[in-house]
């Protein structure tokens, strides 16, 4: 009985290992130079102190990880769709002015550490001075490209 359970656990572990290997092979990491030029320029313009440590691609998106842990998602054309700086403040150069005015007008004691741009507008994750986080959804469609 114990041998049967151990054999089943071993078989499940082997299956997980094989499936994760296949999954990794389906989306191997790319060199940073294979990001679209627009995405490369975005990183250079807004994160000049950081370097790209990993790039993954699917059929219609790119995920870029920087050396400070920042994760940036781009669409297939190289336009950013998500920037997540974890606990750090995001650079504000690329955030639409009206979004910044709204956020800092309504949440003056917060910093933005994540911004997501979608078809319905923006979602931002804010962090208070005490370290608490909240998410705010804002509809500003004029600045989407």
Language model features with spans:
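Bacterial N-terminal signal peptides that target proteins for export
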Residues: 2-11
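Bacterial Sec-dependent N-terminal signal peptides
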Residues: 3, 21-27
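Bacterial N-terminal signal peptides
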Residues: 10-21
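Interaction-mediating elements
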Residues: 26-145
């Amino acid at each position: 009985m114990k041998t049967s359970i151990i054999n089943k656990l071993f078989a499940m572990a082997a299956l997980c290992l094989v499936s994760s290997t296949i999954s990794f092979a389906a989306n191997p990491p790319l060199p940073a130079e294979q990001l679209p030029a627009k995405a490369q320029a975005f990183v250079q313009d807004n994160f000049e102190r950081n370097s790209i440590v990993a790039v993954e691609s699917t059929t219609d998106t790119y995920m870029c990880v920087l050396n400070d842990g920042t994760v940036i998602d781009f669409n297939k054309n190289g336009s950013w769709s998500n920037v997540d700086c974890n606990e750090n403040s995001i650079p504000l150069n690329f955030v639409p002015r009206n979004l910044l005015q709204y956020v800092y007008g309504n949440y003056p004691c917060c910093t933005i550490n994540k911004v997501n741009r979608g078809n319905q507008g923006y979602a931002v994750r804010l962090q208070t001075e005490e370290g608490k986080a909240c998410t705010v959804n804002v509809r500003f469609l004029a600045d989407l490209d």
